[in-house]
Amino acid sequence: MRYRYLGRTGVQVSEYMLGTMSYGSDGNTDERECVDIVHRALDRGINFIDTADTYSHGEAETIVGKAISGRRDKVVLATKFRLSAGDGHNDQGGSRYWIMKQVENSLRRLKTDHIDLYQMHRPDLETDLEETLGALSDLVTQGKVRYLGCSTAPAWYLAETQAVSRLQKLSRFVNETSPYSIFQRAVERETLPAVQHYRMGFTAWSPLNGGWLTGKYSSNSSAPTGSRADRVQGQWGKHYPILQSRFDMQRPGNRQKLELLPELESIARQAGLSLMHMAQAFPLAHAAVTSVILGPRTIEQFVGMEAGFETKLNHPTLDQIDALISPGTLIEEADRGYVSPWLVPASRRHAATGSG
């Protein structure tokens, strides 16, 4: 396993980060297997773990807490806050009220006295950044949190957070987590340049594009049983409705993916790689990327990913990928991750008045 610095924190983290979104009732309900995946990842050299308060309604944090018991000092532990995690009006967001409450819930579930990287799970545009960063800075001062970050934020928001932190002398975000894959290269336009400018870390989520780049899908077959495309038809899809669009085969972008897959598989074969290993290594070829999040749901999936940990793409392979899918390209809009609230139909014209 190779390691990279997390921005300018001086902390070294593994090039691959273990994602736990599929742990618990929204994914793998076999707690023992989930714990075994964590142990296997740690044994393989992964020292960076990603989870969130909303993954399986907090169950993922609980499982991670059990899994790292006795090995906590070997782990750079990241979790998130911001998305709705309760029935109350204030059980979400970037307010001091919610941050101070939810960090205690996460610490309890994770069975730890501190979180290494506490990330805001998408921007909260209804709350002043001074409010959010002030509360988070207090957590750093208290020792409950070591570093701060955000997830799936646009470049302008990253710039604003850095400015507010500097002007108000508050702790800064040291990491951004966004979707980045061969099919989702939009972050190459503005997000990754911003990350490099501010010397932040960058962790890439969905490097396999939700399973599209594993070789599971083709235009000639239905989604394999247990795959994300299959599971979004059930309760999991209801909990994460955007995932239904990501696997809607009638959408033009998804149809284009089906057309591109054979060509990508050909590029991988020429490089002596599987499509999955080429895809999981792809984000690491960008200088701004710190770590790539892999979220195996089963031991079998982890074993498949593990075999590609040492893969490093060469220039000819990267050139072939660029020729097929240009830098900065987003194939399917549903994969973007962050959607401006002003583009959501329900709020697009909420301030409009009159009948003209």
Regions found by a protein language model. Give the residues of each.
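Short, well-ordered coil/turn segments that N-cap beta-strands
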Residues: V11-Y16, G45-N47, R71-V75, T112-D116, ...
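Terminal-tail/helix-coil boundary detector
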Residues: S221-S266, Q270, A285-T290, I299, ...
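N-terminal small/glycine-rich loop or linker at the start of catalytic domains
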Residues: R8-D26, A78-D91, H114, Q119
